[in-house]
């Protein structure tokens, strides 16, 4: 029913199944994804958050959906208990940037390095952006030097241009 886009019918069946089989992870996942298909991010995240009490591996997915829903503090709270360090740190970096907590994001550098996440071009650019945002330009430049991806290289070039503007005309960068 979900695949045929008969969402209400699917929701009715899955909600009943969830009440009858509250421990069934598959029912919870199907229900959450049906809500996702309808753009009901908070409902989907809440269901996965409850399912994560039985299977902690679902914690990252619930946190990600809360992040996409704009509930960054809730996402950050769930993120704290994710076991997979790579998933945890990559997600935390994106949440901190969304919250404009650039200092905290920049302070993740050693953790990102230790877990090998700085090999990921998107993570490296995100870290450079955080460093730029707190005016640590030399460190931001160091990370921008490693970008090879064409789109990220273009963004890095623009960030470098903005750094020059901020150095010469600091009043434009408040």
Predicted segments, located by residue:
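Canonical positions in the second alpha-helix
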Residues: 16-17, 47-51, 78-82, 111-113, ...
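Generic helix N-cap/helix-start motif at coil->alpha-helix transitions
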Residues: 7-12, 20-30, 42-43, 51-61, ...
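Alpha-helical adaptor scaffolds
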Residues: 59-121
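Terminal, low-structured helical/coil segments at or just beyond the last alpha-helical repeat
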Residues: 118, 139-174
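Register position in tetratricopeptide repeats
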Residues: 3-4, 33, 37-38, 68-69, ...
């Amino acid at each position: 029913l979900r695949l045929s886009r008969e969402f209400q019918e699917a929701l009715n069946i899955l909600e009943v199944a969830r009440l009858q089989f509250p421990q069934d992870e598959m029912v919870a996942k199907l229900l959450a994804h049906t809500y996702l298909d309808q753009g009901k991010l908070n409902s989907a995240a809440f269901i996965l958050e409850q399912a994560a009490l039985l299977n902690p591996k679902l914690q990252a997915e619930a946190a990600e959906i809360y992040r996409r829903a704009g509930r960054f503090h809730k996402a950050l709270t769930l993120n704290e208990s994710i076991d997979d360090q790579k998933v945890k740190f990559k997600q935390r970096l994106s949440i901190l940037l969304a919250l404009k907590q650039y200092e905290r994001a920049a302070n993740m550098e050693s953790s990102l390095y230790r877990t090998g996440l700085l090999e990921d071009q998107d993570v490296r650019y995100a870290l450079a952006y955080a460093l730029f945002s707190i005016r640590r330009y030399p460190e931001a430049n160091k990370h921008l030097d490693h970008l090879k991806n064409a789109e990220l290289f273009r963004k890095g070039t623009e960030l470098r241009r903005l750094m020059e503007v901020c150095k010469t005309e600091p009043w434009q960068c408040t």
